[in-house]
C-alpha cells in the first residue's frame, strides 16, 4: 500500500465534494453535473442473459482489435479523442454520452478494491483517475451478493457506470481537459483461490470466463458503445491464464458479437511479456 496513492484517494474525495477542481493553469473544471448523471445512471445487470437472441449488428464492417502495452485510461482517452474522426460519439458533453467503455477488473466484494487504502491494481488505478469509485457506491446490492457467497467464482453480474468523468493521468496529475467514459465493472473468477479451495471445479473456469465476458459485452452492446477497452482481466492476483481470457473474448468477438463494435483495445500493462503475447497470439 502506498501513502501517496492514499493521498490521491483523499484528494479525489475532496474534488467530488467540491464539485470540481482547479488545474495548474488556473482553469476551474466543473464535475458535479457529469458525476450526478453518472451516479444516477449506474445500474446492475445479470447474472442471466441480458440480450435475448441475436445481438443487433453494428454499423457494418469488421471489428478492429488492437493489443497494446498502455494503461486502460490511456487507451480510453485515445479512443475518445479519435471517436469523432470515425463517426463515433464525442468526448466530454455529447448529448448521447461517451462512445467508449472500459472494463474494470473488479473486486467482487469491495467497491474499488483497495483504492482507499492505496493499492495498485487496475481497478484502483481506474478509481484514482476518475470518479468511478463514487458510482460503485451506488450499487451496494452487487457487493452484498458477493460477500454473502462462499465461492470465488463469483457471479455474472455487471455494474454499468455511464459517462464517468476521468480527470487524472497515469502520473496522478489533474488533467487540463478531462473526458468521460463508461465503465463495466465485473470480477473475473479468482482462479488462484478456486485451485486452492475448490480444485474439483477447476475445469469450470473457462466456461465461467466465457459466460461472464459475454455479459460484459452484452451490457456494452445494450448501451450502444462502439469502442471498448478490455485487457488481461483477472490475470494478476486472480491468476487466470492469459491465453484462456484472450480466447474467451476472441470467440465472442468472432462469434455472437462479430461486427457489433467498431474498435476493441486490449490494454495489457503487465511486467511479464508473456501476458501481452498471449493476447497478441489470440488476435493475430
Task: List each language-model region with its residue ranges.
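Macrodomain-like recognition of ADP-ribose-binding/processing modules
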Residues: 1-228, 232-284
Amino acid at each position: 500500500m502506498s501513502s501517496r496513492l492514499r493521498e490521491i484517494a483523499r484528494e479525489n474525495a475532496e474534488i467530488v465534494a467540491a464539485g470540481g477542481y482547479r488545474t495548474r493553469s488556473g482553469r476551474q473544471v466543473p464535475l458535479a453535473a457529469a458525476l450526478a448523471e453518472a451516479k444516477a445512471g449506474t445500474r446492475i445487470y445479470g447474472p442471466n442473459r441480458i440480450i435475448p437472441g441475436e445481438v443487433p449488428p453494428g454499423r457494418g464492417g469488421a471489428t478492429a482489435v488492437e493489443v497494446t502495452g498502455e494503461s486502460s485510461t490511456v487507451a480510453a482517452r485515445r479512443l475518445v479523442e479519435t471517436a469523432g474522426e470515425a463517426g463515433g460519439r464525442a468526448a466530454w458533453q455529447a448529448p448521447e454520452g461517451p462512445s467508449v467503455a472500459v472494463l474494470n477488473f473488479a473486486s467482487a466484494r469491495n467497491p474499488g478494491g483497495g483504492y482507499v487504502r492505496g493499492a495498485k491494481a487496475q481497478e484502483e488505478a481506474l478509481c484514482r483517475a476518475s470518479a468511478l469509485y463514487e458510482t460503485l457506491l451506488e450499487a451496494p446490492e452487487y457487493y452484498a451478493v458477493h460477500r454473502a457467497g462462499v465461492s470465488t467464482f463469483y457471479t455474472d453480474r455487471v455494474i454499468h457506470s455511464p459517462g464517468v468523468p476521468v480527470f487524472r493521468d497515469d502520473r496522478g496529475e489533474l488533467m487540463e481537459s478531462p473526458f468521460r467514459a463508461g465503465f463495466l465493472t465485473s470480477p473475473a473468477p479468482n482462479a488462484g483461490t478456486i485451485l486452492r479451495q475448490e480444485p474439483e471445479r477447476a475445469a469450470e473456469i473457462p466456461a465461467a470466463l466465457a459466460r461472464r465476458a459475454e455479459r460484459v459485452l452484452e451490457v456494452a452492446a445494450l448501451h450502444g458503445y462502439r469502442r471498448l477497452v478490455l485487457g488481461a482481466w483477472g490475470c494478476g492476483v486472480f491468476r487466470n491464464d492469459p491465453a484462456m481470457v484472450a480466447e474467451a473474448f476472441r470467440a465472442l468477438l468472432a462469434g455472437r458479437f462479430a461486427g457489433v463494435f467498431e474498435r476493441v483495445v486490449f490494454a495489457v500493462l503487465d511486467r511479464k511479456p508473456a501476458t501481452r503475447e498471449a493476447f497478441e497470439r489470440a488476435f493475430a
